[in-house]
Amino acid sequence: MADLKITWLGHAAFLLESEKKLLIDPFISENPKSPCSPEDLNPDIIAVTHGHRDHLGDTIEIGARTGCRIISIHEVANYIKSKGVFAEGMNKGGTVEVEGIALTMTHALHSSSIDASGFSFDGGSPAGFVINIGGYSVYHSGDTGVFGDMQLIGELYKPEIALLPIGSRFTMGIKEAVKAVELIEPRIVVPMHYNTFDVIRQDPEEFRKAVEAKVDTKVIIMSPGESIQL
């Protein structure tokens, strides 16, 4: 099993580093909590969970500069390609292997329009990813509410690490995210998508206490720019 380094870049953006570098939802330049600039990032792969601006983020700019491979749901991939940057589409339930990293697209309860240039484009369906990298299974739920088939995700893919939103309003809040942890049963959970803006302000310590009162999952609360090494 190779080493895996996970760095939180604020909001729902993460950099996963093993033999290759995978960047998820690179909302960087407009993210008030971002610890870096898009120019600092040189991923081999970008995975985009859905079309909203705070997730698609700087994907096109980073992709154009680095030539990295971009994976997203079919409609978001088509939008990226319309901007002159190659992207590879997939859909829920499917798995693609890119640079030795397997990405399985999972269900998410959210929306996915792409708002740009005064128009709203079809962004298909929102999604999450189960990522097999460096011998580890990592579940990034994307923006989502809690849903019963999270238990199926846990049974099928057995993610050791879950990256889950707790901000409420647009995603799960703390109560729902705790239930998600119960359903998935990961070894580690990292809360995300909170405190970027006042409208999604939450206390992650409240989440930690609620999780640890119910299950054996370890809660790791990260600061933007902080990394964990597995």
UniProtKB/Swiss-Prot annotation:
Q: Does the keyword Cell inner membrane apply?
A: no
Record-level Gene Ontology MF annotations: hydrolase activity
Coiled-coil boundaries:
none
A Pfam entry, by short name: Lactamase_B_3
Name the UniProt key words of this record, in alphabetical order. Hydrolase
Give the family, as the similarity comment puts it. Answer: Belongs to the UPF0173 family.
Please name the HAMAP family in this protein's record. UPF0173
Write down what this protein is called: UPF0173 metal-dependent hydrolase MM_2300
- Annotated source species: Methanosarcina mazei (strain ATCC BAA-159 / DSM 3647 / Goe1 / Go1 / JCM 11833 / OCM 88) (Methanosarcina frisia)
Q: What is the lineage of its organism?
A: Archaea, Methanobacteriati, Methanobacteriota, Stenosarchaea group, Methanomicrobia
